[in-house]
UniProtKB/Swiss-Prot annotation:
Gene Ontology CC: chloroplast thylakoid membrane
Protein's membrane topology: Multi-pass membrane protein
Family listed: Belongs to the complex I subunit 4 family.
Keyword NADP applies: yes
Keywords: Chloroplast, Membrane, NAD, NADP, Plastid, Plastoquinone, Quinone, Thylakoid, Translocase, Transmembrane, Transmembrane helix
Gene: ndhD
Transmembrane domains' residue ranges: 4-24, 37-57, 87-107, 113-130, 134-154, 167-187, 211-231, 242-262, 272-292, 305-325, 330-350, 386-406, 416-436, 462-482
Reaction catalyzed: a plastoquinone + NADH + (n+1) H(+)(in) = a plastoquinol + NAD(+) + n H(+)(out); a plastoquinone + NADPH + (n+1) H(+)(in) = a plastoquinol + NADP(+) + n H(+)(out)
UniProt EC number: 7.1.1.-
First-tier enzyme category under EC: translocase
Name the record gives this protein: NAD(P)H-quinone oxidoreductase chain 4, chloroplastic
Domain of life of the native organism: Eukaryota
One Gene Ontology biological process: ATP synthesis coupled electron transport
Length: 500
């Protein structure tokens, strides 16, 4: 057990520092912006220091773990702890949230509340990825809903209330199943609740009960991932949210569902996962095709990118369902890769739409001439998203491909069919992305308009874009650095639960 509460400080620091925003002097929004960015940077630097000097990569066990009694009547303990599975999402959270606060620079209305909500999300996300207690996991899962709902309903587009209501209904509805499963697992087999992951991992359940727990948790995660048909909140939410909120949604929120699927369903309910895995692979395969086809028909720029996110998350679902070292490592790599790419595409889409005051693709055209910097960055991230070799998207999807091909869970013919359908999805991806680029940037529609003047990307936008582009290239050239974070933990999960 860790003697110094590093993780508690990392989890609590953003939201506690965020409360001080309301006590800052009334001297304009600039003080609030710089204060929030400094808090996010300090948190990111603290994370990096702790993980570099106090975390052993070759140890698959929980590290930096803490255990403090909180609510004795429920045997509820504050139990943070990290391993190779959680370190990647935590660092991604710190990186994307810091850049999202910088992207939110133009927000001036109620900026104190806006930036506090972003810091509250920051704490909730890190708390979820570092929790090793079922009830703490659930509380952090729910803590995320309130800031997202307020950010949507107060700083969104014209249909923001509809989108925010749809978001809260879907996610809260999914959380009901999580709420039923957590005490069920904790109370089974003993009079006193056992909510920590280590005890639950050693607990055996009747197959029917394990399937019931698994299915309930799966519904909750399927909303956040999202898995079709529980995905319809996502395009509406992305279509109305401010682009800094979209960065957090696409970059981090979707990853919470996949993380829960691995951390709880795969690690704690292995027999049920083995039964459900073919259906997960089937759902992921259909999701790639369906979302890519639907994206091609979207005329709203943000909704097109939102459906591309749904399509790319299909690769993560396939990797998790493959039950192989390669497939699960590929799923984790795809999580991190899409975290960068999704955040970047929504940021660039938002800045572009702010400049031209248009959101529909059929009204755009010719923007590349007055805005060459945005055109260059948008094209580069689109190439990475369509899995261009040398970028993170290509490596992640290729590793998932190899994972499903080498899986012992499936016969030869089903594997051929799955890889064939995945290949079709990878062909559809460049079709809708290149079509989107053509509609926005090529032609002369807007360029020939009278009195048209569009300002190109400024230093702030360029800085955010380049900061995201560097890890995209880095992962594409040397993915082993990211894979080394999780490879030992992945082997431990699979060897302990499937190959014994």
């Amino acid at each position: 057990m860790s003697y110094f509460p590093w993780l508690t400080i990392i989890v609590v620091f953003p939201i506690s520092a965020g409360l001080s925003i309301f006590f800052l002097p009334h001297r304009g929004n600039k003080v609030v912006r710089w204060y929030t960015i400094c808090i996010c940077l300090l948190e990111l630097l603290l994370m990096t220091y702790v993980f570099c000097y106090h975390f052993q990569l070759n140890d698959p066990l929980i590290q930096l773990d803490e255990d403090y009694e909180w609510i004795n009547i429920f045997d509820f303990h504050w139990r943070p702890g990290i391993d190779g599975l959680s370190i990647g999402p935590i660092l991604l959270t710190g990186f994307i949230t810091t850049l999202a606060t910088l992207a939110a620079w133009p927000v001036t209305r109620d900026s104190r509340l806006f930036h506090f909500l972003m810091l509250a999300m920051y704490s909730g996300q890190i708390g979820l990825f570092s929790s090793r207690d079922l009830l703490l996991f659930f509380l952090m899962w729910e803590l995320e809903l309130i800031p997202v709902y307020l950010l949507l309903s107060m700083w969104g587009g014209k249909k923001r209330l509809y989108s925010a209501t749809k978001f809260i209904l879907y996610t809260a509805g999914g959380s009901v199943f999580l709420l039923m499963g957590v005490p069920g697992m904790g109370l089974y087999g003993s009079n006193e609740p056992t909510l920590n992951f280590e005890t639950s991992a050693n607990q055996s359940y009747p197959v029917s009960l394990e399937i019931l727990f698994y299915f309930g948790f799966l519904i909750a995660y399927a909303v956040k991932l999202p898995i079709i048909p529980l995905h319809t909140w996502l395009p509406d939410t992305h279509g109305e949210a401010h682009y800094s909120t979209c960065m957090l949604l696409a970059g981090i929120l979707l990853k919470m569902g996949a993380y829960g699927l691995v951390r709880i369903n795969m690690e704690l309910l292995p027999h049920a996962h083995s039964i459900f895995s073919p259906w997960l692979v089937l759902a992921g395969t259909l999701q790639i095709i369906y979302a890519a086809s639907t994206s091609l028909g979207q005329v709203n720029l943000k909704k097109r990118i939102a459906y591309s996110s749904v399509s790319h998350m299909g690769f993560t679902i396939i990797g998790i369902g493959s039950i192989t070292d390669t497939g699960l490592n590929g799923a984790i790599l795809q999580l991190l890769s899409h975290g960068f790419l999704g955040a970047a595409l929504f940021f660039l889409a938002g800045t572009s739409c702010d400049r031209i005051r248009l959101i529909y693709l059929d009204e755009m055209g010719g923007i590349s001439i007055p805005m060459p910097k945005i055109f260059t960055m948008f094209s580069s991230f689109s190439m990475a998203s369509l899995a261009l070799p040398g970028m993170s998207g290509f490596v992640a999807e290729a590793v998932v491909f190899f994972g499903i091909i080498t899986s012992q869970k499936f016969l030869f013919l089903p594997k051929i069919l799955i890889t064939f359908v995945m290949a079709i999805g990878m062909i559809l991806t460049p079709i809708y992305l290149l079509s989107m680029l053509r509609q926005i940037f090529y032609g002369y529609k807007l360029f020939n308009m009278t009195n048209s003047y569009f300002m190109d990307s400024g230093p702030r936008e360029l800085f955010v874009s380049i900061c995201i582009f560097l890890p995209v290239i880095g992962i594409g050239i040397y993915p082993d650095f990211v894979l080394s974070l999780s490879v030992d933990k992945v082997e431990a999960i699979l060897s302990n639960y499937f190959y014994r």
